[in-house]
Regions:
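Hydrophobic anchor at the beta1->P-loop junction of P-loop NTPases
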Residues: 7-9
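P-loop (Walker A) phosphate-binding loop of NTP-binding proteins
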Residues: 12, 24
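ATP-binding Walker
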Residues: 15
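Walker A/P-loop
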Residues: 18
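Post-Walker A helix-loop "phosphate-sensing" segment adjacent to the P-loop in P-loop NTPases
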Residues: 25-34
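ATP-dependent small-molecule kinase phosphotransfer cores
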Residues: 36-106
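NTP-dependent small-molecule kinase module
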Residues: 100-108, 122-131, 135-149, 158, ...
Length: 191
């Protein structure tokens, strides 16, 4: 018998996944984020070496390799081939590490998984919450936090899974269309 119940929280960039996860954490549930694990994975020597070969412009340092994630982001969001190359390499590692951590926690565990559908990992979770938000709000949110211009944000949105065109009827869809209090209520009602 399983000791835990894994719940993925996913959605496009700027949809409010991290805010939803934060609300869930404030409600006392254990949470994990693939973004946190990504930062850990980027520190591993083997990963840095491989990324330095894949993205030579992102490599800094000679003795101790460092990788500039902003340079990688710029490259991958302007080239579908580079994005696929990066995703094919990193996503399985990040997902494996995240699931390994999640399985050590008993009870309900909420895991933020930005690329859930892109890496076809739906079957790894007992339940999936898809956070959706209107396009203009997503663009404004990402521009405010990331110092990107509208075209760059749209480039990233267009490189991701098409949540608006997909059949999400078998998942729990959380519409982030109001203020924080409204979102908190929706999260409480959903979980």
């Amino acid at each position: 018998m399983k000791d835990n119940y894994l719940i993925a929280v996913t959605g496009g960039i700027g949809s409010g996944k991290s805010m939803v996860l934060s609300i869930i954490k404030d409600l006392g549930y254990p949470t994990l984020s693939c973004d946190q694990v990504t930062n850990e994975v980027y520190k591993k020597h083997k990963v840095k070496s491989r990324l330095a070969k894949m993205f030579p412009n992102a490599k800094t340092g000679r003795l101790f390799i460092k990788i500039d994630k902003k340079i990688i982001a710029k490259e991958v969001f302007s080239s579908k081939q580079k994005l696929k190359q990066l995703t094919d390499f990193l996503t399985p590692i990040i997902l494996e590490q995240t699931l390994k951590k999640a399985r050590k926690i008993q009870g309900k565990v909420f895991v933020e998984v930005p690329l859930l559908f892109e890496c076809k990992a739906q079957d790894k979770f007992d339940k999936i919450i898809v956070v959706k938000r209107n396009l203009n709000s997503r663009i404004e949110s990402v521009m405010a936090r990331s110092n990107l211009i509208k075209e760059q944000v749209l480039e990233r949105i267009n490189s991701q899974f098409d949540y608006d065109g997909a059949d999400l009827s078998c998942y729990s869809v959380l519409l982030n269309d109001g203020d924080i209090k409204s979102l908190e209520e929706k999260v409480k009602n959903l979980i």
